[in-house]
Amino acid sequence: MARRRVVITGLGPVTGFGIGIEPLWDAMVEGRSAIKRIERFNPCGFPCKVAAVLSEDQLIIRKLVPKSDRKATKVMCRDTELAVAAAGAAVRDAGLITKAIDPQAAPTIAPDRMGCHIGAGLIAADVDELTAALWTSRAADGRFDLRHWGASGMENLTPLWLLKYLPNMLACHVTIIHDCQGPSNTITCCEASSGLSIGESMRVIQRGAADACLSGGAESKVNPMAFLRQHFAGRLATTRDDEDPTAVVRPFDPNARGSVIGEGGGIIVLEALDSAEARDADPYAELVGFASTQSQCPDATGLEAEPDGGGIADAIEIALAQAGASPDEIDALAPFGSSIAAIDQAESAAIKRVFGSRAADLPMVTTVPNVGNCNAGAGGVAVAVAAKAMKTQTLPARLNTTGADGLNADAAPSRSADLRHVLVFTTSQGGQNVALVLRRMD
């Protein structure tokens, strides 16, 4: 039996610019960045003091869920709130009716034919929630003691504490709110999570196990514990109080000095083409290629891709083969573009290996300078921007980079472009790589 064709019918990014594709797209075209000094907590003890975040009035979760689900918001961590907001935006953008949109109306997609695959990260608990438990877990010398933690410390955590911070809670809440009863999964592979989730949804629809899926990822590392982990991993730029926060991230720049955290992500509606046609939907693009690989990570910590970009290049080549497209048919690239020197080097090497002399001319779409590194949600943002670019036949502006060696990645204004195929690829902190090929709807 022939595989079903899969299209993107709804976009739901959530970034420092707000909820939905329009605020993000407008900012990308205009060349604006949401990166600014952190206000959610005091960042003075950290070398990096900036991030891209949603303000409190941009995301009021109780206003974004049906009344019947508002009680559940008490056990939603920030990551879950982002995913719920993104899923709601994607559903509305796709013109779907779900239980959350109208509980009295018949759903557009039968619940048992609606899947959900969401990428998530290692969710850090709020420091305030842990303080009492940690305080009572001290030994006589004042140091943390695991025996005290088990005997008395955990008694100071709320009974549902664990259910707030499990990574699969993002998909759990989204599926409950929208009554998605089809195939569901959570993927936790750092920055590759969104792309891997989208690829899994694609395969689920191709083999006929679902007619549509909510897919992508979301994460927030804008809290002291998660921020500290990223600092120890050497991934964050050191910032100065007198510099422009929006100019810190410079992907593929010879002077790139690290990345900046962004909270957010993107969830899209993937749908079988026959389902989309039956309801007269207007897809953004067709998803025609997907591949994943694992880099060998030769260094002791295992945090970065190998310098020659071999694993990344393999993912790109396999995705192109699945799409039936040659490297010469790709019109634009949307890489991770993190501004982390080792990752930039690996991505650059992979691009040059696959595309040869074309690498210097292929335009890039970079999102991290605009919205920060959304980690598990990074690929979801990139796919949403790439799909919108294909629909509008417009390349968004690029920020900050100068002197990219052999790549078309320097800062540039937005412009019209003939985009038939766009390649989106991401490598992760653990060396997982994912590549997706989008094709224009003709």
Where are the predicted features?
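Conserved beta-ketoacyl condensing-enzyme motif
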Residues: 8, 29-178, 182-185, 218-227, ...
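ACP-dependent fatty acid/polyketide chain-elongation machinery
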Residues: 1-72, 94, 274-286, 384-399, ...
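Active-site-proximal alpha-helical scaffold in enzymes
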Residues: 83-96, 167-171, 175-178, 184-219, ...
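Active-site nucleophile and cofactor-binding loops and adjacent substrate-binding regions
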Residues: 42, 75-81, 109-111, 161-167, ...
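Condensing-enzyme catalytic core mediating Claisen C-C bond formation in acyl metabolism
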Residues: 5-9, 36, 241-323, 331-332, ...
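Acyl-CoA/ACP chain-elongation machinery
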Residues: 39, 211-257, 290-307, 335-345, ...
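Glycine-/small-residue-rich "gating" segment that lines the acyl/pantetheine channel
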Residues: 138-157, 199, 203, 218-277, ...
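Short, well-ordered amphipathic alpha-helical segments that serve as non-catalytic structural scaffolds
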Residues: 83-95, 272, 306-324, 350-354, ...
